Structure formats: structure tokens, C-alpha cells
């Protein structure tokens, strides 16, 4: 008999809602545990099956920690500003707020249908003025500390866009044209707000060491910050009093510099270009205007450039170096100028070959006529550096440069300041007023939040000036000071990153109108103990959140230096064909259908049993139905055809389940603690198999089993808990314990093979049967790597010896 998932799940979701079962008190003698997901952008498509994977993982940890005696904070909110809502509003004439709120409701209903133990009293939405009031407050504090400033920044400008020119994001530019409509895009300087994240570069780098994060994520952050120690070198321009400053990590290769390259936007280009080269330079600059930074720095693209006609002098040997411009050098990195050493840099070598420029080896090894030699070696053709190794030569070159006032040691960062302006309507207004007398002021703190004005469909269209549509809201835009001076509000809005850079703090005190959050509550809850989300946010979101958190720590607003102590990235759920799910491929699975047909608990069990949380794995409809069959089997173990507790659940304990029960409590506890959900479920399956062989099921063991099931399949567990005669719900019942003395027994090591090759092993009870051995084998992480997505053709199991899984 199958259990009725629809009525059971509706019943317990209603119960949890009415009793506010998961509301977390801010004052408790219990130790706190703060667990959260990266909050979703509520798109019009709703949830896909990838979302519940991470959400189920955090929910299991929340439920487990509650049972272990922790005061658990498990909140949810909405990262709800974003371009799609604005595009929808322009197209339909509907307000983006209405579109967004409708999407939020769809997401919320879907999330609630999965039975997550969320404290909904703390729900936040980044588009709520009472929320973005504090985003604006943080901006004002950054401004007051000199960490928010205006600068001329190159943007992607589409002047021919219908309704007037528009600025588009890098990701909206494809081959020099807008993604929507295919209108030409040009690079154009425009005033933008910028946040000085570089002031925190060293701390952002150093404090990574204290975090329990995947090493790969830490490495990506280190790479993005890109700290390097090198030298600034000054090259005098021939027949000019100007100098070009170059930053290089390899001053030891100065003797190999053969030409110089400036970015086409470099301030000296027009000044130093000779009359003969002016037309070529102007044409090249126009050609580059339509290329994004991503296109320009693509390593595989053909090298292009133009000669300025000017020369610079190499300070170390006096050689004249031709000065070129090329798009592979960006004005935003370093000084926007490089010394080219084609013998030992791939891009410089390709450029030199393309334009027939000389190549001179200064490090021994390789054939530089065939390819750049980028390994280490002894210095040659380098005067006083000859015979030295890399580090010795770098140190000596820097000393020489400093002695001759031709350069100095320099620490550089790849990290650039954060461009904080967006030419959009649907974002947080930046609380600045520009006055006609040339001054600017912040909107007074007492007047925050500065709310977005209601706008018509016509007003939401591009302003035509490059400003956001807010420039069309004249009543909102124009202000007059008490002394009669007129002013205009800032028309740029904040990027979507703003709301997600501090939301974890607002969950702590979401309804506070006087402060971002109460200091005592922050002291109790921070920092976040477990943060789960996709690896695609490994760099920017986490870096920006860490930056704002450190700034707020310096202000004394938050009590910790870092926001997230432990970070886990869930793996991607792929389509059945191992491809990424996408609408265009037609392989997207809607979780609503799974919940409707199989139940939320089935989806939860299946997604956690698919494999290790952090690995990508393919979706399988057969796997879903298999998970449902197991839950039906659990139900039948305890409940009869009359919907009553079976007679063989008894207070009598014959002892035949003692060992497997205590083994299961130990294994499941350890696995949940370490987020090994697939092997925890596997152990529960082993226990169920053994329980079916027993004539009497001790009620104490059945209680414990249902408690262990509860974090993973909470609706079914609650129903079984009530069938077992308990009045209270299961959420706060103390986690079962095991007796170490019951674990002492004869054990044996068994081998797991795939196609005859050893892929794993485990220590198990000597009397284990074939089915249980197979369950252990399938749960082994390494075995899963070799059988995932393959057809199992045969299984050979010798009890106490080995399991061999034959796949095709």
C-alpha cells in the first residue's frame, strides 16, 4: 500500500505554518546555528529541480541541528531587482513591482510545497523600500568615508536603440551588437559611481585563510584579487618630455623588451602619434570601440594593432622601442601600457610575428623563433643579469631601477574598484543630489529610503542620453534647495549585487526601522555557520559581500570580520543525457510535477541520494520512482492496510536489531554532521532491510529510525511519529543516541569492484547479506563516479568478500 503524499504533506505544512514551528527566538540559552541558502532571483520561470538540491541540504542541516539542541535560524528572501522585470514592464506597460511580486508568490508557494523548515517571519525582499533604505544607508557611509566616488568609465553604448540610446551590460553584448535587436554597440566614457573595494584588497586576501570554504573557491578569489609584486618602470618617449609608466612582474626581462603597447584609450596616444600615423590610429580606435573587454582579451583571437610612429627608450639599455596600440591591452588594468617581451610571452610573441617585430631571447631554453619560451631558466643577453636565476635577476633589476630613478618595486592587484552604477530604473536609487552650483550632497539620512517613483510605460523607455529612465521622471528628478539652488537627483541605480551584499544581516532583524539590525542580535547570530549556493557566485557575490561586511565591521556595525564561516557549493543537476538543463534543449524538469506525482519527500530523498552533494549528477526519472518505492516501503513497515500502526511494533526487544540500530544511529549522525546525505540515506535503507526480517520491531528503535528520517523526509516522518503515539511534533525531539558497546562485533572488509577493478572498500558486519552489500557499494562515492549514467548489466556479490558491478 502506498501512502497518500498529497494529504499528508498538506496536513503537516499547514501544521508548521499555524504553529510557527520554525520561528527562531532571538534570545535563547541554546547555542545558535545560522544556516542559509543563496537567496533566489524570482524569475518568471519559477523553480527548477536544481533549486531544491541546495535548499534540501540546508533544510536537513537545520532539522538535524534543532534535534541536536541548537537554536536554528533558517531564513529565506528574494533577490528581486533585476533587468528582466524592467524589460517586461517596458514591453507590457505593467509595473515591474507587480510582475516581481507575482513571481515571488510563485517561488514562495513552490518552496513551501517542499516542506522546508524556514522561519518565514524573517522573509525579506530587496525591492522593499524598508529593505533598500539600508542599502542606501550603507552607500552613504561608504561615501562619507571616501569609499564611493564618481569616475569616467567606459560603458557599452547603443545609440541606435529604439526610443533613444541605452547603456547595456557586457553580457548583453554579442559580437559588437545588442543581444536584443542587434543594434551596434560602442565603447563610450560615462560618469559612474565606483566603490573603492581595492582599499580592502589585502584583508580580502588574508582573511580567506580563516574560512572553511572549498579550496577551489578560495583560489578563484585569490586569482580575482590578483596580488602580485613587481616593478613600475618608466620609459621616456623620444622627442618628448613625457614618460610611459609600465607595471611588470618580470623586470628581469627588460633586456628582452622589443616594443611597447598602449591601450587604444591611453591618454598619451593622440599626443604622441605622428602625423603620418594619425589616420591609421584613428581608424583602429574606431574599430576597437565596438569590442567588449571580454572580446579584446580572448586569448584565441587574432592579434590586431596600429603603430603610433613614436618611440620610447628602454631605461636599462637605451634601445629605442616602437610604440604600438592594441586592443589586448586594457586601460582598466595596470597602467594601460606594457613593455612587450615577445620571446617570453605568448600574446607578445603572436603580436610580434603578426607585425614582423624583432624577438630577442633573454632566458635560456626553447626556440623563440618557433614559440615563446615561458618557463624559467638562466638569463642570457641581459648584461649585468646574465647567469642569474629568475628571483635573483628580479631583485637585481629592481635595485638597478631604483638606483637610477628609472622605476621601483610595486605591489599591484588585478582587482579593480567596483563599478556601482547601472543605467536602469528597476534598482535601488542612489541617494545623491547634484546641484547646479557644481556641488553634490547625500539625501539626508532622515529622508531615507529614497523611493523609486511610479513610472508609465512611456517613461520607462530609454532616456536617449545614456541616463537611466529615471531621467524621464521629472517630478521626482528635479529638486530645489531652501536657498533656491536647483538640483537633480542621481539617475543611476545600484547593481543587483547591492541587495545581496548584506542580506544575511537583515535576516537577523528584518523589521527594524531604526537600524540595519540590532547589535545584540547580530552579536548572537553572526556569523553565518553554513552558506550553501552555486559555484557560479564564487567570485563577485562573495567578494562584494565580504567587502561590505568588512566595511561594516570597521564602522562597528557588525561583530565579525567575515560573514560566512562555512561555504558549500552544491553540484549541478544535469539532464538525463548529462547536458545542462535548459529550455532550448527541452530537458528542464519542473519540481511541481514531481511533488504532485511523487511527493515532496520523494524529491528530497532522490536529490540527496543521487550522489555527493557537491558533485554534478544526471537526473533520472527511474531514480525518482525508486525513491518513492523506498518511502512506500518505509510506510508499510510501520502502517497496515487499515492505516493503523502494525501489531509487530512492540515494546518487546528480542535483540536482533540491536547492532544494526546502533550502527545506523552512529553512521547517520556522522554522515549528517559532514553533509554526506547520500550515505546517510543508504544506511537508513540498510536498516529498513534488516527491520523487514525481524518479527518484532522495538518501538524505541522505530522512534529513533523515524527521527533519523525526519530531516530528509519530514512530512512522512511527522505522520509516522504521530502513528507511533506521540502528541508533540518531531522537530524539537532530542536526536537519538547510540551505545558504543552494541557496536562491538565481528566485522569484515569487503571490496567494491566495477568491471572487475577495485573502486572502493568498506568494513561491514560479517553476516551482511548481498542486498546490504550492494547498498553500501552503490553509496560509495568512487563507485558512483564509475557507474553514474551507465547501464548496470550484472551484479556479482559474494557475502563477506566483494561486490562486482558490471556496467556497459
Curated annotation (Swiss-Prot):
Entry superkingdom: Bacteria
Catalysed reactions, semicolon-separated: tRNA(Leu) + L-leucine + ATP = L-leucyl-tRNA(Leu) + AMP + diphosphate
The enzyme's E.C. designation: 6.1.1.4
InterPro entries documented for this protein: aa-tRNA-synth_I_CS (IPR001412), aa-tRNA-synth_Ia (IPR002300), Leu-tRNA-ligase (IPR002302), Leu_tRNA-synth_edit (IPR025709), M/V/L/I-tRNA-synth_anticd-bd (IPR013155), Methionyl/Leucyl_tRNA_Synth (IPR015413), Rossmann-like_a/b/a_fold (IPR014729), tRNAsynth_Ia_anticodon-bd (IPR009080)
Compartments in which it is found: Cytoplasm
GO CC annotations on file: cytosol
Motif interval(s): 'HIGH' region: 40-51
Residues annotated as binding ATP: 583
Keyword line: Aminoacyl-tRNA synthetase, ATP-binding, Cytoplasm, Ligase, Nucleotide-binding, Protein biosynthesis
Pfam family, one: Anticodon_1
GO molecular function: aminoacyl-tRNA deacylase activity; ATP binding; leucine-tRNA ligase activity
Motif stretch ('KMSKS' region): 580-584
Keyword Cytoplasm: yes
GO biological process: leucyl-tRNA aminoacylation
Record has Cytoplasm as a keyword: yes
Main location: cytoplasm
Similarity comment: family membership: Belongs to the class-I aminoacyl-tRNA synthetase family.
NCBIfam families with a match to the protein in the record: leuS_bact
Name of the molecule in the record: Leucine--tRNA ligase
Species of origin: Leuconostoc mesenteroides subsp. mesenteroides (strain ATCC 8293 / DSM 20343 / BCRC 11652 / CCM 1803 / JCM 6124 / NCDO 523 / NBRC 100496 / NCIMB 8023 / NCTC 12954 / NRRL B-1118 / 37Y)
Organism taxonomic ancestry: Bacteria, Bacillati, Bacillota, Bacilli, Lactobacillales
